[in-house]
Regions:
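Intrinsically disordered, low-complexity serine/threonine-rich repeat tracts
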Residues: 29-62, 67
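Bacterial signal peptide processing site
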Residues: 24-27
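C-terminal motif of bacterial Sec signal peptides marking the signal peptidase cleavage site
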Residues: 19-22
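A surface/extracellular/periplasmic glyco- and lipid-processing/surface-interacting theme
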Residues: 63-107, 112-371
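Bacterial N-terminal signal peptides that target proteins for export
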Residues: 1-9
Length: 371
């Protein structure tokens, strides 16, 4: 009986062993633990932000520099003074001139007795210095002054000329009965005739004009008819280092010669066999531009005198020299209150060289030659 128990117990033990063996030694292999893998999260592709396009920096527009309306020269401040025209003695016994070297424009023309006289125009009379010698008024001087809204300066005039002046309404300063003028005693002592001794300082003329209640400010709305360029040498012009201006009227002749001086950059003024120099400074009278206005000149008998009066309204032909070259041009003046304007023969505007101008009023019989 004990034997049976033993066998039964053995069977139980063997069964248990099989169970435990299956549990203890039979772990199924497992894959090692791994961290979960993640794909990188990417945002939708976007373009990098860009700055809006910017325009290239631009320089602010520069204000045009103020210029002298009669010469085109750059000046420090806007010119606001009214122009002055001065009647200049030009007969040989009256020379040398004073102050013509400072004129912006200088007109020469027959006036009476087949002699010429000058009309010097200044945009800045206050700084013109001593001017003269000053002589009496002539018809065309009033005419030109009116066209440029200028105050005309003179030493009297005949009854007919003074009547014409009053009719024109042009403001004037008369050295015979107004202040601002002086007689040069040194000239008188050295033998000059009295009529060749009257002078005035520009600043004194300005003061006298103000004293008399004349408007002394420039009409800034007025077009003075001139355009300028740094180099006014005319394209296609003929060589003209010397321009000989033989003013001829009724068989009488007066010659002015303009000689180009490259060092001075303009034409020196020669007459009576001499180069004109300033009586105060000794400097040569020199002009960047030489203009010849060809027109009809008539004799007019008035107050017992014979005057030479040029037709300065309308249009006509002429010449222009600058930089050693010369061309034919046209001139125009539309009325008594208008200045001169100049064009090429094809009608395009003429550009003058920056600087002063000598202008000859030439009767139609005149001879203009150059070389």
């Amino acid at each position: 009986m004990n034997h049976k128990i033993t066998l039964g117990l053995l069977a139980v033990l063997m069964a248990l062993a099989l169970v435990f063996t299956g549990c203890a030694g039979g772990e199924e292999p497992t894959e090692p633990a791994t961290e979960p893998t993640t794909e990188p999260i990417t945002e939708a592709a976007t373009e990098a932000p860009t700055d809006p396009p910017t325009e290239a920096p631009t320089e602010p527009p520069t204000e045009p520099q103020p210029t002298n309306p009669l010469t085109g020269e750059v000046v420090e401040a806007e010119m606001t003074g009214r122009f002055f025209c001065v009647s200049i003695n030009n007969v040989k016994p009256a020379l040398p001139h004073r102050g013509v070297v400072n004129a912006d424009m200088y007109f020469e023309m027959f006036i009476n007795d087949y002699c010429t006289r000058g009309l010097a125009m200044y945009a800045d009379i206050e700084n013109a210095g001593s001017i003269g010698s000053i002589r009496s008024l002539r018809y065309n001087f009033t005419d030109i002054a009116q066209g440029y809204d200028a105050i005309v300066v003179h030493a009297g005039g005949s009854d007919s000329v003074m009547s014409d002046l009053r009719s024109s309404g042009v403001n004037n300063l008369n050295g015979n009965n107004m202040g601002g003028f002086y007689r040069d005693s040194g000239r008188k002592a050295s033998g000059y005739a009295t009529e060749h001794t009257l002078f005035a300082y520009g600043e004194d003329l300005l003061a006298e004009a103000a004293k008399r209640g004349y408007r002394t400010t420039l009409d800034t709305e007025k077009d003075f008819g001139l355009t300028f360029t740094a180099d006014g040498t005319p394209a296609g012009g003929e060589t003209a280092n010397t321009v000989n201006i033989d003013l001829i009227h009724k068989g009488y002749s007066k010659v002015s010669t303009m000689v180009y001086d490259s060092d001075l950059g303009g034409y020196t003024y020669q007459q009576y066999g001499k180069t004109m120099v300033d009586d105060t400074t000794g400097g040569k009278e020199c002009f960047e531009n030489v203009i010849v206005i060809v027109t009809v000149v008539e004799n007019k008998v008035a107050s017992g005198n014979t005057y030479h009066v040029a037709e300065l309204e309308g249009s006509g032909s002429g010449y222009f020299a600058c930089g050693g070259k010369i061309i034919s041009i046209n001139w125009k003046r539309s009325g008594p209150n208008a200045p001169f304007s100049f064009t090429h023969t094809d009608g395009t505007p003429l550009e003058l060289g920056v600087g002063s101008s000598y202008i000859a009023i030439a009767p139609t019989a005149s001879q203009i030659t150059w070389q």
